[in-house]
Amino acid sequence: SDHAVKGSYDWFANWDFSQFLRTEEKDGRREFVMFDAEGPGAVVRIWITVANYNDNGILRFYLDDSDIPAIEGEVLSLISGHFLADAPISTSVSPLTPYKQRGHDLYLPIPYETPGITAAGNRPPGENFFYSVNYRTYDKGSIVKTFTLDDLKKEADVLDGTQRELMEQPILEGKYQKKVSGDKAITNLS
């Protein structure tokens, strides 16, 4: 609701889309800043989902105060389209859901001294962009080798082995399971 009250069940109900830190002008285009933090550190997970997406969104990773992005490409291609890595490090769920309606995840560590990630492009009216960036900040003075695509290519065998090992792990069942039949839904997990 547009008039949600703190403490009500719908406080800020699903109104968290397209909320960016700021908008910047760069090379004649508007860029929407999603993430900015003190370094050194590493982005360890990015989650994105979209609504009314027109396939024109560009994601740019500016690292170490560079004006040239270390990574640049169409949003879903970068996050879950295997541009940087394969499954399960770059993935989207659920496969039963249409691609643009899925949650898209990238678990590839992107180390930096000073980061900045922008979602750029012309956002048409009605386009909704939901995201979460998880990161780690290291102690001042920690030595971090900033991410480069060249280093990613050099370490392709390590990345392939990691992806393969993760995919070969068995799916563990929970200790407690409850089968719900019919039109019932679990509304309490205690």
Predicted region positions:
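Beta-strand-centric surfaces of beta-sandwich/beta-rich domains
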Residues: S1-S190
